[in-house]
Regions:
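N-terminal presequence-like segments and the immediate start of the first folded domain
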Residues: 6, 11-90, 94-99, 104-107, ...
């Protein structure tokens, strides 16, 4: 009789564990579903909507920024490197603002550059766009060529604070 009683307690305990695990799985699936339902494309007001991508995609509290190149009004990279960097970062800032975020919400930045000797020119301008000392994780990688003569292409991920 005691053996049956112990088996029933174990079976009951296993049942409770399985029910609890199932509830957490349902909760996790609901959270993912809720985040996906809040997904929206971000477009700058002057965006070329003929291009097959968005300036960014906001999914829940996370913004994925498409690769950007610092092009002037003529659609080309400016002659001055500092101007190209500022145009690029101003565009990134504008995409973030469309999503209700700031540069300080960036958590990851990838910069492709056609001339790695420009690293030291890029950094002080880049740093000036942040108000926090806690900068995002970043990589600065070489690229053989970028579209429209650009020297830099930046893509990033931001998470709302």
């Amino acid at each position: 009789m005691q053996i049956i009683s112990k088996l029933n307690r174990r079976a009951g305990l296993v049942f409770l564990v399985l029910v609890a695990a199932g509830l957490f799985s349902v909760r996790g699936a609901f959270s993912q579903s809720a985040a996906q339902s809040t997904r929206r494309a971000i477009h700058l007001p002057d965006a070329n909507l003929q291009l097959p991508f968005s300036d960014g995609v906001l999914a829940g509290n996370t913004l994925y920024l498409a690769g950007r190149i610092g092009l002037d009004k003529s659609g080309k990279a400016p002659a001055e490197i500092n101007d190209e960097i500022k145009i690029l970062l101003d565009q990134v800032k504008a995409v973030l603002e469309q999503a209700g975020m700031t540069m300080d919400d960036l958590v990851y930045v990838q910069i492709a550059c056609t001339d790695l000797s420009l690293f030291d020119k890029f950094n002080p301008i880049y740093r000036s766009y942040f108000t926090t000392k806690d900068l995002p994780a970043r990589e600065f990688i070489g690229a053989a060529a970028l579209l429209r003569g650009g020297h830099f292409e930046l893509q990033a991920i931001a998470v709302r604070r």
